[in-house]
Curated annotation (Swiss-Prot):
Its EC number is 6.1.1.16. It comes from Prochlorococcus marinus (strain MIT 9515). This is Cysteine--tRNA ligase. The keyword Protein biosynthesis applies. SMART domains: DALR_2. It is found in: Cytoplasm. It comes from the Bacteria. It catalyses: tRNA(Cys) + L-cysteine + ATP = L-cysteinyl-tRNA(Cys) + AMP + diphosphate. Zn(2+) binds at C27, C211, H236, E240.
Length: 492
């Protein structure tokens, strides 16, 4: 059974869906710029959750919004001498490019705030009618003190928040708000800014109300899972709960899941610290999409993820092992060794077959148990690595010993291991990438250097022999001395 940490209860709970179809809402991006590593961390984690639910035979409807009207978008439009729509559409296209590269499944629906203005206005009218909202001079605010449960997600103290907010209000806000903690549902239009018609005059929606309206319109009044980063717990998700539950008299979501933040070399990632990295910058610098995905999955989604060059390099090396294993058939076919998946198992010894099937079933159970345990991707990755190692080792051995004798039992073991590896990596969204050999060196060049090294050794020029060995290792070639006269090699 799947167990998830619920931010609302502060406990790990058994997941029990409302209906046959699991309804999930994920807070999307404000589309004014390229996505950064924090977005990668969040959307990779939730993509694995979605994939695992599907793997566990659940039907899933996954909705993720776009905030396409916001102060940041308007500011960017002004800087670029463009329009709000042009900025948002451009960055939506860039968002898809990044997410597709990382192997993130596209949501079933991706509503935009600007397409839900009528729904948003209707939602606010309900809150106003019930006494949870009040209009002042073209603005509409939510009255926090009317909601006795406000703060239940974040454990915020309303009175303390009220005091803290008093010094942050503009003079206009202090004249309009009943209390400093009250937040905007509708904002009066400013001169020369895009606006929409509403019962309170021209304006645009507040950030929080957008999600409440879109959740209801896309998924209904109560959903199974609501997702987002830990930075959204307060005020965004707290305010979503307040709005939705006040309007609908129903629980907004049964499970609230939040991912941890990204640090860079132990410091919070931010533009002010100049350690801010976009997904595009990282991929353009040579990091493969699956290396980044693998790196994100090595740490539990709720914990902070510390991004360092060393950690990324380590992830790259580990991913190479898995990627080579996933490329098993491509490599063995190139070397004219046939170990096809559909090859007959007729001549495999029954006891051997039972042994291998049992071992693989145990690995699948461990993999599933890891993800059942609050999406423990690090534990799942460990099982993936266990499956990849024997495949990688066989390739190394095969490249070293060209006429390697392999029996039907061993072929069966390799085929079943690869089939399982492909199945489980798909759950984590890890997919085979082209193997790029840096400083590529041909077989003829390798043999020539091996012969030169043997001559150097015979002449007791061990410094030259070591120099050749180290030079080949830098090019990804490891030498294995079988005897004083025979040296074989393998690509690392």
């Amino acid at each position: 059974m799947i167990k998830l940490f619920n931010t609302l209860s502060k406990n790990v709970e058994v997941f029990k869906p409302i209906d046959e179809e699991v309804k999930i809402y994920c807070c999307g991006v404000t589309v004014y710029d390229l996505c950064h590593l924090g977005h990668a961390r969040s959307y990779i984690a939730w993509d694995v959750l979605r994939r695992f639910l599907i793997y566990s035979d659940y039907k899933v409807k996954f909705v993720q919004n776009f905030t396409d009207i916001d102060d940041k978008i308007l500011k960017r439009a002004k800087e670029e001498n463009s329009s709000m729509k042009q900025v948002s559409e451009k960055n939506i296209a860039e968002f898809h490019k990044d997410m597709d590269a990382l192997g993130i499944m596209r949501p079933d629906s991706m509503p935009k705030a600007t397409n839900h203005i009528c729904n948003i206005c209707s939602f606010i009218k309900v809150l106003e009618k019930k006494g949870f909202a009040y209009a002042r001079g073209g603005d509409v605010y939510y009255s926090v003190f009317k909601n006795k449960d406000y703060g239940k997600l974040s454990n915020q103290n309303i009175l303390e928040q009220n005091i803290n907010q008093q010094g942050r209000m503009t003079s206009d806000e202090s004249n309009k708000k009943n209390n400093p903690q009250d937040f905007a549902l509708w904002k009066k239009a400013k001169e020369n800014e895009p606006s929409f018609d509403s019962p309170w005059g021209k304006g645009r929606p507040g950030w929080h109300i957008e999600c409440s309206a879109m959740v209801k319109d896309e998924l209904g009044e109560t959903i199974d899972i609501h997702l987002g980063g830990a930075d959204l717990i307060f005020p965004h998700h707290e305010n979503e709960i307040a709005q939705s539950e006040s309007a609908n008299n129903k629980k907004l979501a049964n499970y609230w899941l939040h991912n941890g933040m990204v640090n860079v070399n132990g410091q919070k990632m931010s533009k002010s610290l100049k350690n801010f990295t976009t997904i595009r910058d990282l991929l353009d610098s040579g990091t493969s999409p699956m290396t980044l995905r693998y790196f994100v999955l090595t740490v539990n989604y709720r914990k902070p993820l510390d991004f360092t060059d060393e950690a990324l390099k380590s992830a790259s090396e580990a991913w190479k092992t898995i990627n080579v294993a996933l490329s098993f058939f491509d490599i063995t076919k190139k070397e004219n060794l046939s170990i096809e998946v559909n090859e007959t198992n007729e001549f495999v010894e029954e006891k051997y077959k039972e042994k291998i099937n049992y071992e693989i079933s145990q690995k699948k159970i461990k993999f599933t148990n890891a993800l059942n345990n609050d999406l423990n991707t690090a534990g799942a990755i460990a099982i993936i690595y266990e499956l990849a190692k024997p495949l990688k080792n066989f390739i190394n051995q095969f490249q070293r010993i060209k006429n390697l004798d392999i029996n039907t039992n061993e072929k069966f073991h390799l085929r079943e291991t690869l089939k399982t590896l492909e199945e489980l990596t798909q759950v984590l969204g890890l997919k085979k990438e082209e193997i790029i050999i840096e400083n590529k060196i041909t077989e003829e060049q390798i043999i020539s250097l091996i012969n030169k090294r043997l001559i150097a050794k015979k002449g007791r020029d061990y410094a030259e022999a070591d120099k050749i060995r180290n030079s080949l290792k830098e090019k990804g070639i490891e030498l294995i001395d079988q005897s004083t006269e025979l040296t074989t090699w393998v690509r690392l």
